[in-house]
Amino acid sequence: MAKKLSKRREALLKKVDATKEYSVDEAMATLKELKSAKFDETVEVALNLNVDPRHADQMVRGSVVLPHGTGKTVRVAVFAKDAKADEAKAAGADLVGAADLIEDIQAGKIDFDIVISTPDMMGVLGKVARVLGPKGLMPNPKTGTVTMDVAKAVENAKGGQVNFRVDKKGNIHAGIGKISFDADKIKENFVTLLEKINRAKPASAKGRYITNAAVSLTMSPSITLDTSEVMEIK
């Protein structure tokens, strides 16, 4: 099996010029040639930003709703009470609650991909911040997941919202769809994400903002992008 996989990998590597910086259009076309898995692979974006997230004013994070969605089925948990809980349920939230959800999380039951909360419930959520935080699940106003408009937040989450956050090394990783999508739709999702990230450039960030950019499939080698073109997407 290992030999078969290595041959497949070798064949894929021959389709990508590792010395080249691809235009966005070239990269989208090449991605289609790299499909090799039996499942519908995710199209992934990897960026390296010239920021130092140890400084609060250089933390790059946010969210964006991709025009063509992510192709993933997303399970949404909402912390809300009374009328807001009813709104969340009506909007299609998978889990809605308060103290009961806290107990489930403390017991290790994390059966959701995104957490949304009304502002008044954030104190309750503090009890599980150490569990949700490292998993990137803690609600945050910057990603639109702390809000009174829970119905809209649920719709966004279900409709293709991507949350991004730079890690301590300046990297951002995000999925922007499935390889079964038309190339034009993958590109539109990519452009929508990059517009948001480029507009989120901290005023204190100096020099070249995006130092490296690449796209890939779940099982494929990476395609390096022309960062000059990528930074012009605004």
UniProtKB/Swiss-Prot annotation:
Keywords: Repressor, Ribonucleoprotein, Ribosomal protein, RNA-binding, rRNA-binding, Translation regulation, tRNA-binding. GO terms for molecular function: rRNA binding; structural constituent of ribosome; tRNA binding. It holds the Pfam family Ribosomal_L1. One of its GO terms (biological process) is translation. One of its GO terms (cellular component) is cytosolic large ribosomal subunit. PROSITE patterns: RIBOSOMAL_L1. InterPro entries: Ribosom_uL1_bac-type, Ribosomal_uL1, Ribosomal_uL1-like, Ribosomal_uL1/biogenesis, Ribosomal_uL1_3-a/b-sand, Ribosomal_uL1_CS. Belongs to the universal ribosomal protein uL1 family. Binds directly to 23S rRNA. The L1 stalk is quite mobile in the ribosome, and is involved in E site tRNA release. Protein L1 is also a translational repressor protein, it controls the translation of the L11 operon by binding to its mRNA. Part of the 50S ribosomal subunit. This is Large ribosomal subunit protein uL1. The gene is rplA.
